[in-house]
Amino acid sequence: MQEPVPEPVQEFTKVESIFVRHRNCLMIRAEFTPIFTDYYLHLMDIEERHPENLDTTLKDLLAILTLHLTARPWAETIAWTANIRGPRLNFFATGSSVHEYITGRLFTEDVREPDRNFLYSQTTTQGKEPRTSTIEVETSDPLEWLRHFYDQSEQRPGRAYKLPNDTYVLIAAQPDFDQEWFEGLNIEQVAKISDEEEPKTRATRRFKFACG
C-alpha cells in the first residue's frame, strides 16, 4: 500500500483579517508553522539554541506582533522590545506590513536590568516621525503584553489567544463593540467564532520570517 504523501509546509504564514459582524470586533487569525519553521532553520544556521521557556516566549512574541501589524494600517513598520528583569532578558521583534516580514531575537548578555518589566514600541511610517510608547508589563507572557498595550497605547481592548497547531488569534474591539461578548470569550469560543458568528474576511496578508 502506498504511503500517503505529506502536504508540504507553506513558505509563508497567511494572516486573515476578519470582521465579526454584530459584535463589532476585528479577528486576526493565522497558523504560524511556516514562520516557526524558518525561525528554527535560522537558529540552526547561526548555531544558537534557547531554553524551551525562552524559545516559547520569543515565538509567541513573533506571532503576536504579526497579528498586531495586520490589525494596524498597512504602511507601518513596528518594533517591540521587552526588557525583563530577573533574569535579565531582552525579547526583540520587528515586522513590516509593507514587505510582509517578521523577525526577532533573544538577548541574554549585556542586558540592562530595569527596576520593572517594560515593553517598548516604535511605529514607523514613511515620511513621518517614529511614534514610540512605553508600558509596564507584569509578566513574561507576550499575550499579556498585548492586552496591556492595547489598553494603554491603542486605547481600545485587544486580547490574544493561543490555539492548538501553532494558531494564534487577536480579537480587537471596534467602536460600539459587544463588550459582554468580548469579555466573556475563552479559547474554546474563539476557536468557534467562524462557525457560530457572522465573519467577513476583509484582507489577507502573507508574512515570512526574515533572517535579518
Residue ranges and their predicted role:
Residues E3-G212:
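Interaction interfaces in information-processing and related assembly proteins
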